[in-house]
Amino acid sequence: PIGIDTYKEEIESFLDSLPKMPDAFVCANDHVGCILLQLLEKRGLRIPQDIAVSGFDKNIENPLSESLTTAEVPTMGLGLRLATQILFRIQHPDDPFEVIYLATKVLFCSSTES
């Protein structure tokens, strides 16, 4: 199974399977985006001149994340909204479901700016 410990190997395998590199990658999260940045640079690709990369979630734990374009997710608001919805669902199991949107902010960095 794919997990945090196997991301690098799985991404390398995925890159090897591509007949041609795309112009850009939009990653599911910043952790994957930072791994991808390293692997693409290791292959001699220039970021962003040859290929652009973006992440999602503004993970500040990785030093590479400073160069990664990302979407800043309001995690506190997301957690509070989720908890509220769970409590509501427990109290009202037959009510209709809702679709809820939370605004994100795109933070443009050097991984997409050329």
Predicted regions and their residues:
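Short beta-strand elements in bilobed, periplasmic/extracellular small-molecule ligand-binding domains
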Residues: 1-8
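Flexible loop/turn connectors
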Residues: 8, 12-114
